[in-house]
Amino acid sequence: LQVRPYHWRPSGSFLAHLLKATTQQHHRALAPTIARLVPPTAVVFDVGAHAGQYTKLFARAANHGRVYAFEPGSYARSILRTVVWLHGLSNVAVVPMALGSEARLDTLTIPLKSSGSFGFGLSHLGKPSERWRAVAQEIVAVTTVDGVVKTLNLDRLDFIKADIEGWELRLLHGAESTLDRFRPRLLLELSGTALTRAGDRLAEAFAFLAARGYRAFRFEAGASLAPVAESADGDFWFIPAEDPAANANLSPQRHGSEPGP
């Protein structure tokens, strides 16, 4: 495994990544569900914002609210900032930090493809995986959800999305006060392999949220959410049991010949 210090300059691959992030919309099928679970005045934390695909969806849903897009990686953040500017997302604030269980400095590992370009979608904190032939690394700042809420003096937090390659449980540990106080809805990408690399286990993430009164759901065809009984890899929506959305029919309502999403 080759480990290199982070160094970046504009290249053809950067322009390709930027063009893709600017002109394409991933996760389009989730837009109706996000619109139902993220009110127009919502405050949203998009953690691991990457190149802004979810950020764009949240910005449209919370068009009278505020989206905080957390992205510690310099390469991804340079794309994210440009996407936010080009799309005129004035309700988005890009935050150059990672979120975890405590405030500190850590190492962000960015896989390098055989072409030499960054596999920045798989960037993660901590030790590099042996599956990669070469990686770049940079030092980044880590803080907590609770710390950000206190610093910004937020009086609400409606939604947290986190896709941070195994650090999701660490994020939850740093958000305990916020989860209890604001009961935000969550969208988490959970991988047993990635969580193990971070020193955690998949079942622990589900148990942590269940103990705090959250119910797990999974997106299914037809833009509906189905309850989940057991821990597994995938993208999961966690909704507080007392939240009406946890017991509502979350399938989109169709009227006459109105087109679907």
What are these regions (language model features)?
Residues L1-P261:
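Phosphate/nucleotide-binding beta-alpha loop and adjacent structural elements of enzyme active sites
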